[in-house]
Amino acid sequence: MKEVRGEMWELAPQYDAVCITTNGFVKSNGEAVMGRGCAKQAARKWPKLPAVLGERIKTRGVYCAQLLRTSGFTLFSFPVKPGSVIVAQDKSNIVRHMRKKFAPGQTAPGWAAVADLSIIEESARQMKLWIDSKPEYKTCILPRPGCGAGELTWEQVKPVLEKHLDDRFTVVTY
């Protein structure tokens, strides 16, 4: 796994596959919540993307999914959060700015959860399988999964990714 600094969308055309970090929550209108980070940026670039991701989540669950092809790369979801979570007694599984809105034991939407290392690991495993099985995908770029709105540290996430991602994968830090 390689690491670079830069702006992901400027670097994206140099890669065959681009991953955006996502959660598994789907709104009542069928659209996925894409309200932060690179997911929000992608939803602004491709306005139909929340509906596409919402449909993928509804039909396949919280898995890596091919979302769209551009002239330069294929865009994939890279889940880091579940569809929903039961709020822990100490609320430690809810992002800090949302803790006042939920009570322990309540079900909170996945977008309000702290990123989940087991979901990140499964996403890394799935993306490696995608890249392994499709010869047209030789390189893949993704942000540090779970390290922005997911409130994990890179020190927590990096060892999980290193178990699965080889040098075809580049993690970008902005």
What are these regions (language model features)?
Residues M1-Y174:
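Macrodomain-like recognition of ADP-ribose-binding/processing modules
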